[in-house]
């Protein structure tokens, strides 16, 4: 649940009955500590000792926890140990700025050097001063909305600035503190210090919570030590926001992760016709070497975003910056956890340095997630557009599809785990329904090829063919409620973010207004051209139906596979969401209540016309009920993958047999070894069963 100033503890409390009727067991809350005013996510904490006032404060939070418990709902709370906001209301940081190294909070933050370098200026200090934008007022340094403390004041403004414990610089420069990724406004903490852990966690650990979700654990100096402290202090469930690569295993004990691994294994079941999709993409943009493309993007962000940080680490390790670049750019996962990857350390230089200075190597490890996230997830995923339903957090774009046997092997390793089965989150590039709809395009490659060519001729955009191709995929995947003005603006915002993240023709640091305007014209042309819209809708209609079938199949896999199903922000019905901030759009709980009320039993019209979302709501409540009623089998029971024909995925959990369509454009028939009851439809089937638009969940009749 995304809590915001416009959706508070009280608002959530007023909807608890809805979650209970839906079949939810636990609420999973976004951060609740005091944050920057107006924040719509809460990861920009300013005070660890206060429950956020804009959400209702401590009294309303306690009341929510009490009401949730009395309703039979547990609460998992998201916490942010890695960083805080650089903000005037962060009084610990303000004390550091005022007192420098004399402040007791100097070691609260991950600082370097003798002064704090604050890159908050819109231009160079000299230019900002010449424009009169900095002044001393009421004993504070005032710049725009900033109010900074002063340790010394003299008659000369430059002299005053030079005598402070901080230095103001342009936003283009790197700060003298470790950040969350490259975000200058989020300063990292030194949780390896026991007193920092106690002070930053003390408030929340006093509340009666069932579990914690730990944000960005890979950014911490020693994640294993941190988790030991957390387990000593907190008896409940601990879930990590740990993004695992394919085959990667967490090297320390934990209850589970937030489930990006499940999302990506499942995602690869739904894509087909790799050769044809590859051929079309190569015709449009030329041949792309994925491996070298990923490395190029990582090298780019190391040079442009993290050069100062990594140069400092290289000096501490006693290696050349180039050696460090080669090593980190080679890694295909977030962090090495103290073990140097020998395959990427080709000359052994990093291994030798790590043996001599493990502390410095761990400092390097704290930057590995930033390089991977910014280089791969926030650059390459916006450059390589072969089939963008695959471009997700934790993905591996060297892979196109997955054989069900590999999915079954993954699932067998998760039996009994509390890891989430996530399919949509605030970090996913697209919501599950968008991904499944785009994946449905892969089932009709020739028709797609023809449409792409036709649409290009109709619009004739003056943009990179790669950006044009992505736009067509985004439009197909996210179109749902018509060519409205709201949708037009959402697409423009998404495409602007896409091209800036790709860092090819424009970027956040160096915007190319002329190119960006051409991309906006492309969006407008698509909306304004009636011939294009007619052609688009001819294609979108059948793809929408196939995408919905795939979404329902994914829903069944999520709920009945090993792990804990995770539902994000209204995804119990159709939610066609784009990259953040679009995926934080508010949820209309009144509409969800109406849908829930209208989907208590299965009717033919819910299947014949799925657009109103009742079928997904019905399937969600039905599958969650099946899970509750068969909890032992679904949670700890044996898992057996079934051998089924291509286009299907099936498995057994105890006495339950689950069969879903991963290929939506055709129907299938499966032979049975007796009589079964379908727990989704209620019908009795024997000898053989058709796998139509709904997943099959079968129990054998004794």
Label every model-predicted segment.
Residues 1-183, 189, 198, 206, ...:
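Acidic/aromatic-lined carbohydrate-recognition and catalytic surfaces
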Residues 631-633, 656, 665-682:
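Beta-strand-rich binding/interaction modules
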Residues 522-540, 613-639:
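Amphipathic alpha-helical
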Residues 684-702:
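C-terminal beta-strand-rich structural cap/linker in extracellular carbohydrate-active enzymes
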Residues 346-347, 419-422, 434-544, 552, ...:
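Extended, charge-enriched "interface" segments that sit outside catalytic cores
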Residues 223, 228, 234-236, 265-320, ...:
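Polyanionic (Asp/Glu-rich) segments that form extended negatively charged tracts
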Residues 333-335, 418-434, 471-480, 554-582:
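Conserved phosphate/anionic-ligand binding catalytic regions in large, soluble enzymes, centered on
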Residues 615, 625, 641-671:
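Carbohydrate-binding surface patches
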């Amino acid at each position: 649940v995304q809590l915001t100033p416009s959706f508070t503890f009280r608002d959530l409390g007023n909807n608890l009955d809805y979650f209970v009727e839906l079949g939810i067991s636990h609420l999973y809350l976004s951060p609740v500590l005091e944050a920057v005013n107006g924040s719509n996510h809460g990861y920009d904490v300013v005070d660890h000792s206060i429950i956020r006032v804009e959400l209702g404060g401590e009294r309303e939070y306690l009341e929510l926890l009490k009401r949730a418990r009395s309703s039979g709902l547990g609460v998992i709370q998201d916490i942010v140990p890695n960083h805080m906001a650089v903000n005037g209301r962060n009084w610990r940081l303000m004390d550091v700025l005022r007192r420098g190294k004399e402040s007791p909070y100097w070691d609260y933050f991950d600082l370097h050097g003798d002064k704090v370098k604050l890159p908050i200026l819109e231009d160079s200090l000299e230019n900002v001063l010449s424009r009169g934008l900095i002044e001393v007022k009421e004993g504070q340094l005032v710049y725009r909305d900033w109010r900074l403390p002063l340790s010394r004041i003299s008659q000369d403004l430059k002299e005053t600035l030079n005598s402070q414990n901080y230095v103001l610089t342009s936003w283009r420069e790197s700060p003298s503190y470790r950040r969350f990724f490259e975000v200058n406004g989020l300063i990292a903490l030194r949780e390896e210090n026991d007193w920092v852990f106690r002070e930053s966690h003390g408030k929340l650990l006093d509340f009666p919570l069932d579990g914690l979700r730990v944000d960005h654990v890979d950014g911490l100096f020693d994640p294993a030590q941190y988790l030991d402290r957390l387990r000593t202090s907190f008896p409940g469930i601990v879930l990590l926001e740990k993004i695992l690569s394919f085959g990667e295993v967490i090297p320390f004990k934990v209850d589970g992760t937030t489930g990006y691994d499940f999302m990506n294994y499942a995602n690869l079941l739904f894509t087909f016709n790799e050769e044809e999709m590859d051929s079309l993409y190569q015709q449009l943009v030329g041949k792309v070497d994925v491996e070298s493309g990923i490395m190029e993007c990582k090298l780019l962000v190391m040079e442009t975003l993290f050069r100062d940080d990594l140069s400092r680490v290289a000096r501490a390790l006693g290696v050349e910056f180039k050696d460090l670049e080669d090593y980190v750019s080679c890694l295909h996962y977030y962090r090495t956890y103290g073990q140097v990857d020998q395959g990427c350390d080709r000359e052994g230089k990093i291994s030798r340095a790590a043996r001599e200075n493990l502390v410095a190597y761990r400092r390097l490890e704290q930057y590995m997630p930033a390089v991977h996230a910014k280089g791969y997830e926030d650059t390459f995923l916006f450059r390589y557009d072969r089939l963008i339903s695959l471009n997700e957090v934790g993905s591996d774009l060297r892979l196109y599809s997955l054989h069900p046997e590999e999915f079954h092997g993954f699932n067998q390793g998760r039996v009994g785990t509390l890891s989430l089965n996530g399919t949509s989150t605030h970090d996913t590039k697209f919501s599950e329904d968008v991904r499944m709809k785009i994946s449905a395009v892969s089932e009709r490659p020739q028709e797609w090829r023809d449409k792409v060519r036709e649409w290009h001729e109709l619009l004739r955009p003056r943009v990179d063919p790669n950006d044009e191709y992505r736009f067509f995929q985004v439009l197909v995947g996210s179109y749902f409620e018509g060519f409205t003005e709201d949708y037009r603006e959402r697409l423009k915002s998404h495409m602007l973010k896409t091209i800036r993240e790709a860092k090819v023709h424009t970027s956040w640091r160096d915007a190319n207004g002329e190119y960006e305007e051409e991309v906006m014209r492309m969006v407008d042309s698509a909306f304004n051209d009636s011939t294009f819209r007619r052609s688009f809708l001819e294609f979108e209609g059948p793809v929408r139906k196939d995408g919905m079938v795939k979404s329902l199949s994914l829903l069944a896999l999520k709920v009945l596979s090993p792990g804990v199903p995770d539902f994000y922000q209204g995804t119990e019905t159709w939610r066609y969401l784009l990259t953040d901030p679009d995926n934080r759009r508010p949820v209309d709980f009144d509409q969800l209540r109406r849908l829930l009320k209208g989907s208590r039993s299965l009717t033919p019209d819910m299947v014949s016309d799925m657009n109103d979302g009742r079928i997904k709501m019905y399937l969600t409540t039905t599958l969650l009920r099946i899970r509750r009623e068969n909890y032992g089998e679904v949670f700890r029971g044996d898992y057996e993958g079934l051998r089924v024909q291509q286009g299907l995925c099936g498995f057994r959990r105890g006495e339950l047999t689950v069969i879903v369509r991963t290929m939506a454009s055709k129907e299938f028939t499966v032979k049975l070894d007796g009589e079964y009851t379908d727990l989704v439809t209620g019908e009795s089937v024997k000898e053989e069963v058709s796998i139509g638009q709904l997943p099959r969940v079968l129990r054998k009749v004794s």
